Design a protein with these regions (language model features):
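C-terminal beta-strand-loop-alpha-helix "lid" module of Rossmann-like NAD(P)-dependent dehydrogenases
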Residues: 1-264
């Protein structure tokens, strides 16, 4: 057998292995999309309870302004924590480029120094190539069960960084991710999580407590408010991660279907 024939057979075998990998990833993507979408829906009740608690704290703060926390205005030198969700694996088309470019476009327009935490090797590389300060990187969770530990670690790391800030600094927190969108599979989204939006606070405070007996908020609401804000951040990051994973798998499935059509 000539060397060229042997090389050709190796290439054919390699192509067969690649097709098998693509088929496997296609099947996994199809089964995972529903899991991630259902996990977002499952957050709704908990999100509602946290929102009701926040609304009660905001109402008390309005009734007792001296107990409300001091507001600090963000300055040009204040840091920004940006969490960007991408992917570790390929075969997702422009998925990582889309969200990386969105973050790269938005962050320079914000008043502050951006410090980035990237979820996914591929989006991390894209952000570093753009010159952004990537302080941390995380592996993309492979299941719904792995999302909560990831979010908890992100909260620990970003909170540790916030603790290093000066007492007069206000660290903003932004999250960037792709979210499902019917017409084009997904679209890039960005949200400021901290500081809390004043209009949003007013809207929560305007929602009446559902029971006849209103809860008592202890410690002028400071301790309770801090705990509820941490839960609000957890919910927001969990939702962003789950939506990103649903979008990633939808993109991978579309890529696989396009590949199958091209081979037909």
């Amino acid at each position: 057998m000539s060397d060229s024939t042997a090389a050709l057979r190796r290439k054919i075998a390699g192509a067969g292995d690649l097709h098998a990998v693509v088929r496997t990833m296609k099947a996994l993507a199809a089964s995972s999309i529903g899991d991630y979408e259902r996990s977002v829906l499952a957050l709704a009740d908990y999100d509602r309870m946290v929102s009701l608690g926040l609304g009660e704290c905001f109402r008390q703060a309005r009734a007792n302004p001296t107990a409300a926390p001091e507001r600090v205005t963000a300055g040009a030198s204040d840091p920004i924590s940006a969490i960007v969700f991408g992917s570790d694996q390929g075969l997702v088309g422009p998925f990582n480029d889309v969200i990386a470019e969105h973050a790269i476009d938005v962050l320079p327009t914000l008043p502050g120094r951006a410090q980035v935490w990237a979820v996914g090797e591929r989006v991390q590389a894209r952000l570093k190539d753009a010159g952004l300060d990537v302080l941390g990187a995380y592996a993309v969770p492979g299941s719904v069960e792995a999302i909560a530990p990831l979010v908890a670690q992100i909260q620990i790391d970003t909170e540790a960084r916030r603790a290093q800030d000066g007492p007069r600094q206000m660290r903003q927190v932004h999250v960037f991710h792709n979210r499902p969108q019917a017409a084009s599979l997904y679209e890039p989204a960005g949200q400021r999580l901290l500081p809390l939006d004043a209009t949003w606070q007013q809207s929560l405070a305007a929602v009446a407590w559902p029971g006849k007996v209103r809860p008592e908020v202890l410690d002028h609401g400071a301790t309770t408010l801090g705990a509820l804000i941490r839960e609000y951040l957890f919910i927001s990051l969990f939702r962003a991660c789950a939506e990103s994973l649903a979008s990633e798998n939808a993109s991978r499935l579309a890529f696989s279907l396009a590949s199958d059509s091209a081979q037909a």
